[in-house]
Amino acid sequence: MAKAVGIDLGTTNSVIAVLEGGKPVVLENAEGERVTPSVVAFRDGETLVGRMAKRQAVLNPEGTIFEIKRFIGRRFEEVQEEAKRVPYKVVPGPDGGVRVEVKGKLYTPEEISAMILRKLVEDASKKLGEKITKAVITVPAYFNNAQREATANAGRIAGLEVLRIINEPTAAALAYGLDKKGNETVLVFDLGGGTFDVTVLEIGEGVFEVKATSGDTHLGGSDMDHAIVNWLAEEFKKEHGVDLKADRQALQRLIEAAEKAKIELSSTLETTISLPFIALDPASKTPLHLEKKLTRAKFEELIQPLLKRLRGPVEQALKDAGLTPAQIDEVILVGGATRVPAVQQVVRELLGKEPNRSVNPDEVVAMGAAIQAGVLMGEVRDVVLLDVTPLSLGVETKGGVMTVLIPRNTTIPTRKCEIFTTAEHNQTAVEIHVLQGERPMAQDNKSLGRFRLEGIPPMPAGVPQIEVCFDIDANGILHVTAKERSTGREASITIQNTTTLSEEEIQRIIEEAKRHAEEDRRRREHAELKNALDSARVQAERVLQERQGAPEARARLEAAIGKAKELVERDAPDPELKAATEELLKAVEEYEKGAQAASGKGPDDVIDADYKPAD
């Protein structure tokens, strides 16, 4: 049976895991790393993903895309702050969604995410020796409907059957609690690169029940990096009058240096940020260098506003679960940003206990997703996962009010129906406006979509009975139906936010991805053929130097070597490269045979002598 994998598609890094013998195992990528940077770069007609993409970011800031998770499933008007912080171009799409522009070509966040997924899956397939087609993909618990749908679409574009979209903290709890025997109430504190989630669960006898979840999709480790970036840029501007953030290459260097400093300050009390030749003096045109000492105390001062924002979701999750900090048995830290000592201190202050460090914060989410994949594939038994919807869902009613049908923290899957009526006499159609959020007025909440129910018989206001049903599936994705009871007329909508892709767009992107995959495969094959010919040439040259063969064979081999050199330099087509490699290997073989024959002619060439030990 084909394997299904678990994928943590992260803001800064991504991880893929699989079940081996009932235990989740993280799979290394082609570079031998367990964690793959969530970075995609477009350079000279080729697409780089992961470490290779991250490495060349400073030289190619406009063509290197990172933190794409901050843009997925969002409207352009919602991401103005995030768009200013990245060196690449973020532009509005025709649907009001987000697009990334590289050299005049527009990419959706789903396409970029699919490239990361494809890299993870292709590398894992090679590692396992079998093609992977099924996956469970994780998302922040606080992702809304549009963001979940967009993530599922990214999986489809990558050629995957997405078995389930599950919440990151829930996945982490699965990995933590799989072998636990007793009952525990745990709080998962998940601070990743770009999102923050707090989830309270009860774990016992294979049942993982989410009691409450809260969070902030605009808060993570990269916000800490940007706090350092802003400080460095301000200090440099004060000193030299140059705005480094206006230069895309300088901004990329600042971002990388800030991330490095943040990581170092988790284990040391101070670090030096050194960026030589960061800019030119506007007056003298001489190079300017940035050299700045950053202490842990200063770093904690810079991120103080972010640390304060961690408190609200923790308190909200506890309140919604009806628990006090003393009733929490374990606090599980998830996400790389939880390594920051000041973050751990906030956890201690809020919950009055030392956090549990038994899980790897970078890998535990993917491992939990692999367990859920095993559950769905029937490999893991006696595990039941009961998750919740993170935000309330409802419809707009008279006066612009949001009427809630499904309150936040309702266990999913779930179905809820309510009866509504018309506001005007002889109204023959109603518009159902579906909303997600916690504010009382419709305009203050997230609009998920609108649809019309037509053909209502003319009746006085308040007489028609319109049944509106909300259905949330196990992925947390919403389906809404409206039915007029007297006629049985029905209308429905699978909520696709205007920022998510239509089926036609998804199919177009899938086809494009397949074409690119074919191009990539051809490019790789071509490179391998060139390398094979070049390696054969090097081997042939060594044989010429080390062995003495017949003059005619030598001339043939030298000619084949010369031809190989010329074809590699000319970047010849594949058939020529293949033929030249075969020709060269044959010439080497013939030359070596001749050389062996010459060296082993028998008695005339061999001097017989007794063996005498040296004195």
UniProtKB/Swiss-Prot annotation:
Coiled coil: none annotated. The modification Phosphothreonine is found at residue 195. Induction: By stress conditions e.g. heat shock. Residues 592-615 are annotated as: Disordered. It holds the Pfam family HSP70. One of its GO terms (molecular function) is ATP binding. It comes from the Bacteria. Keywords: ATP-binding, Chaperone, Nucleotide-binding, Phosphoprotein, Stress response. Belongs to the heat shock protein 70 family. Acts as a chaperone. NCBIfam families: PRK00290.1, PRK05183.1, prok_dnaK. This is Chaperone protein DnaK. The lineage of its organism: Bacteria, Thermotogati, Deinococcota, Deinococci, Thermales. The gene is dnaK.
